[in-house]
């Protein structure tokens, strides 16, 4: 199961890397950032194919998207100087709590 979660973490990493490139692509007019974005998304989905066999798809997707949202919000704050209101910060922590709760019951759902 550890290997499965490593694949899931890798998928989150590649999805976040691709999403962080979105502003750099300038509406997909810049070839190299656009190609890198596509490559990162392909890697993310490739890794997810190994995860979906071990974790129910709803839990896999909730974890992938939840951790991606949390990470992108933090990186957007750091690299793009985007502000986060206290409500957004609270919401992000609730997402993390939800991901932890959902994954703590993964074995019982399989």
For each predicted feature, which ranges?
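Polytopic alpha-helical membrane proteins, predominantly small-molecule transporters/carriers
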Residues: 1-110
